[in-house]
Structure formats: C-alpha cells, structure tokens
C-alpha cells in the first residue's frame, strides 16, 4: 500500500500598506501643516488690521469732536446750547489734563536735573605727622585735625589722598620748614605736589622752592601750592619735599587737602 503526502502550501506574507495610502498620508500632513501656518499668519494680519481700524476710529472720533467744537464756536443752530456747554466742558477738562501732565513732567525733569547737580560734596584736609624724618613723601596724621567729607576720598597709606569720582578738584598744600644752614652752600628747599594716575604713573603738578635762612634760631618759612586739576577715579595726589628733616610739624604749619568743584 502506497501512502502519498502532499506538501503544505507556504503562508502568504502580509503585504504593507499600498503606495497610494502613503502618498495620501503625506499630502494630508503637508495640508495640515500649511493650514496651521496659514491660520497663524492670518491671525497676525487680522490682529494688526483690527488695531489699525481701532486707531482710525479713534482719529475719526477726535475729528468729529473738534468739528463739533468749531460748530459750537461759530454758533450754528443745529446744536443746542446744552450740548455746546457739555462739549466745551469736556474740551476744557481735556486741555486741563494735558497741561497738568506737562507740568508734572516738567517738575519731574527739573527735580532730576536738580538732583543730578546735588552731587555729594567731596573735600579733605589733613595735617602733617612727624612719624618719618627721612621719607621724601610727607606723611599725614589719620587723627586730630583731619577732615574727609565722604568715602569718595580716602587717605591711603597715610601719604596720599585718593579720589573715587571723576571731576575738577582744587588741590592745595602748605609746607612749613625751618632752616638755619648757610644759604650760600645749600640748594633751595623744594616742595612738589604730585599726581599718581590709576595706571600707576606719576607726574608733578606743581612745584615751589624757597631758599634757606641763615638766622639763628632758624626762621620758619612756608611754601604754598594750589591749583585746579581734573582727576580720574582711582587717581591720588601727594606732597614730596627735598629735605623732610626740615619740615615743621606743629599744628597748622604743614597741611594738605582738596575740594571737588
């Protein structure tokens, strides 16, 4: 007996979506995106258009209001006296409000200008300190007859006055010295007012000299320096002398200061 076997047929593979469906979905997506962009642009245009229409309507109302005022002034009969009085009252209130607003702005501007002019007064005055008889840069006492009007000027290292605000300053110094040396054989006593810039460079602003006295006991002599200079923030000024051992440090003899103009 012969048995026969039949080969089972292979399963069919499921086919993917047809090409037409893919094209349809692609076109639908493009259409939706285009519609969204178009809707956004149209909304922006509509918003701007409505704003423009609103402005035009306001201008038209203002024009009608002005024409009505002119008609009331000319006394045309189409408007009653009551309406004209009401319109005049509205116009007067409008003008009064504008004038008050201008007056307030003017006062605020004047106050700001006045406030800007009221910069803090910057001033300093210090007297000498006999802590060093050898340093050519004079030392100034941090206490006693000592004035610093604000923290915008400081005494740094006891030697120099430093400013923190740019401006025009009057700077002065008085140096009193005592000398009884032979005047013929000695160089004059020289005092210099010097500037140190924020970058660290130094230069002489003012310089004065006086000859020695041969009188005994020694005669007190004073050198006065003073001038107007523009200082930058971080700049400092100091006093230099040729012979610090001859400087007199009594009260009021030797002093140094500045004032912002």
Swiss-Prot record:
UniProt-annotated glycosylation sites, renumbered to this chain: 240
Cytoplasmic compartment segments: 1-22
Disulphide bond pairs: 178-218
Sites annotated Cleavage: 112-113
CC terms in the record's Gene Ontology section: cell surface; extracellular space; plasma membrane
Domain THD: 122-261
Post-translational modification: The soluble form derives from the membrane form by proteolytic processing.
Subcellular location: Cell membrane; Cell surface
Extracellular side: 44-240
Family: Belongs to the tumor necrosis factor family.
Function: Cytokine that acts as a ligand to CD40/TNFRSF5. Costimulates T-cell proliferation and cytokine production. Its cross-linking on T-cells generates a costimulatory signal which enhances the production of IL4 and IL10 in conjunction with the TCR/CD3 ligation and CD28 costimulation. Induces the activation of NF-kappa-B. Induces the activation of kinases MAPK8 and PAK2 in T-cells. Mediates B-cell proliferation in the absence of co-stimulus as well as IgE production in the presence of IL4. Involved in immunoglobulin class switching.
Protein name: CD40 ligand
Source lineage: Eukaryota, Metazoa, Chordata, Craniata, Vertebrata
């Amino acid at each position: 007996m012969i048995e026969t076997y039949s080969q089972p047929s292979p399963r069919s593979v499921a086919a993917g979506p047809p090409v037409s469906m893919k094209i349809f979905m692609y076109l639908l997506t493009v259409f939706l995106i285009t519609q969204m962009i178009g809707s956004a642009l149209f909304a922006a245009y509509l918003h701007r258009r409505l704003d423009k229409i609103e402005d035009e309507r306001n201008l038209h109302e203002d024009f009608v209001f002005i024409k009505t005022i002119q008609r009331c002034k000319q006394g045309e009969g189409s408007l009653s006296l009551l309406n004209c009085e009401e319109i005049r009252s509205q116009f007067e209130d409008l003008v009064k409000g504008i004038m008050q607003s201008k007056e307030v702005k003017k006062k605020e501007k004047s106050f700001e200008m006045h406030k800007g002019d009221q910069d803090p007064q910057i001033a300093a005055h210090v007297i000498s300190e006999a802590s060093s008889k050898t340093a050519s840069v004079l030392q100034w006492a941090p206490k006693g007859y000592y004035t610093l009007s604000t923290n915008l000027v400081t005494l740094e290292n006891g030697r120099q006055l430093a400013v923190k605000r740019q401006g025009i300053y009057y700077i002065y110094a008085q140096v009193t010295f005592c000398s009884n040396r032979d005047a013929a054989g000695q160089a004059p006593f020289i005092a210099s007012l010097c500037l140190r810039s924020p970058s660290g460079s130094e230069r002489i602003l003012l310089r004065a000299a006086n000859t020695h006295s041969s009188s005994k006991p020694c005669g007190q002599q004073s050198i006065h320096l003073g001038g107007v200079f523009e200082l930058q923030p971080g700049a400092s000024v100091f006093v230099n002398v040729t012979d610090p051992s001859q400087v007199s440090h009594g009260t009021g003899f030797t002093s140094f200061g500045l004032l912002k103009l």
